[in-house]
Amino acid sequence: MKKFAVFASGNGSNFEAIVTRLKEENWDASAALLVCDKPQAKVIERAEAFHIPSFAFEPKSYENKAAFEQAIIEQLRLHEVELIALAGYMRLIGDTLLQAYGGKIINIHPSLLPAFPGIDAVGQAFRAGVKVAGITVHYVDEGMDTGPIIAQKAIEIDEHDTLETIEQRIHKLEHKWYPSVIKQLLGLNNRGEKA
């Protein structure tokens, strides 16, 4: 059985969408671990509801980034994680984690990269007046939203859209497509079985 981890910092709606899809489709895979850098985040409650172990840590309690990333690596190895999916994890991945899991860390970003990297991507797109927005799933490298693109999905924006409606539509895209990309990268077929 393939095992993956999800890293999140907040509410965890993408985490829930991934795990729900895994269970509904009975994947031959396991969400083996949630990693969270905010011990009070709602996503931890979601993990508990699904009986998924979590590693919640306070970055300031570690000497430096390398130290907390080493603690994360120990948890990933303990849970035999093969793939890491960032889902609203609001930290850049450092050298320590990249050296251990390079090419096995993916992220979902709410824009059609390379446009609008970083925070508030949907707001940036809305203020720019673009006619097309979307999501990007990409491999993580040392930069911010700069890794090789795996998949993109787009939506058209019209004059009736508001920032809120665009955000809602982007979230729906994320919840639909991120689990599909994870399943594909785990080498599972459409029924969630090993391909």
From Swiss-Prot:
For biological process, the GO terms are:
'de novo' IMP biosynthetic process
The active site of this protein is located at H109 (proton donor)
Recorded protein name is Phosphoribosylglycinamide formyltransferase
- Task of the protein: Catalyzes the transfer of a formyl group from 10-formyltetrahydrofolate to 5-phospho-ribosyl-glycinamide (GAR), producing 5-phospho-ribosyl-N-formylglycinamide (FGAR) and tetrahydrofolate.
Q: Which SUPFAM superfamilies match?
A: Formyltransferase
What top-level branch of life does the organism fall under? Bacteria
Q: In which pathway does it act?
A: Purine metabolism; IMP biosynthesis via de novo pathway; N(2)-formyl-N(1)-(5-phospho-D-ribosyl)glycinamide from N(1)-(5-phospho-D-ribosyl)glycinamide (10-formyl THF route): step 1/1
Q: Which reaction does it catalyse?
A: N(1)-(5-phospho-beta-D-ribosyl)glycinamide + (6R)-10-formyltetrahydrofolate = N(2)-formyl-N(1)-(5-phospho-beta-D-ribosyl)glycinamide + (6S)-5,6,7,8-tetrahydrofolate + H(+)
Paired cysteines (S-S): none
Family stated for the protein in its record: Belongs to the GART family.
